[in-house]
Regions:
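Short helix-capping/linker turns of helical repeat alpha-solenoids
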Residues: 38-45, 52-56, 60, 73-81, ...
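Bacterial N-terminal signal peptides that target proteins for export
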Residues: 1-11
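Terminal, low-structured helical/coil segments at or just beyond the last alpha-helical repeat
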Residues: 129-179
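C-terminal motif of bacterial Sec signal peptides marking the signal peptidase cleavage site
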Residues: 17-20
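Bacterial signal peptide processing site
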Residues: 22-25
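Structural signature of tandem alpha-helical TPR/SEL1-like repeats
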Residues: 58-66, 91-101, 128-134
């Protein structure tokens, strides 16, 4: 009987250790140099692109676009297509391309993409006419997000961020940084 307990304990410990190795993310210092480097470069590219877009200077848009393109393969949360859509809006809206990018980001449950889709169809913004039913669908999709259930960011806060990013009369982007 004692051998069975030891074997079971050993098996349980082994499975736990194996699961830990398999589930290790690139955020861990021991996750491997290449994995960690890719994660850090992705984070750097996204941070730089966001800052360039929030600054609102059209001279920075080409670099922001290149950074987003390079970050694309590492994106799992829909950030890249969301910020690509914001870039297109700020450069001069092409509605179909913007909608395609936002739908890609929304499919990955990006909260700001869903808030921007709501804005497009509720005001209307970019679209020629409002579509209240479609807008409500996006409002409901936002409410189903895990972040919405936790209360951060609230729908109103997500809308404020979106408004700051696409409002060409406020190029400073001060609200985006939380000031």
């Amino acid at each position: 009987m004692r051998v069975t307990r030891f074997s079971f304990s050993t098996l349980l410990l082994s499975l736990t250790l194996l699961a830990g190795c398999a589930g290790q993310s690139c955020d861990e210092p021991l996750s491997g140099e290449a994995c960690r480097d890719e994660k850090l470069l992705y984070q750097n590219d996204m941070l730089q692109a966001k800052l360039l877009i929030a600054a609102g200077d059209p001279e920075n848009y080409e670099l922001a676009g290149a950074l987003l393109k390079r970050a694309g393969p590492g994106d799992t949360r829909g950030e890249v297509p969301f910020y690509q859509a914001v870039l297109l809006i700020n450069e001069g809206p092409q509605l179909e391309e913007v909608l395609d990018l936002l739908e890609k980001a929304a499919a990955r449950k990006h909260p700001h993409a869903i808030a921007l889709l709501y804005k497009i169809w509720s005001e209307p913004f970019l679209a020629t006419e409002a579509d209240p039913l479609r807008a409500e669908l996006y409002r409901a999709r936002y409410a189903d997000l895990d972040v919405a259930k936790s209360g951060y960011p609230s729908f109103e806060k997500a809308q404020a961020v979106v408004n700051t990013l696409v409002d060409r009369s406020n190029p400073a982007g001060a609200q985006v940084s939380g000031r």
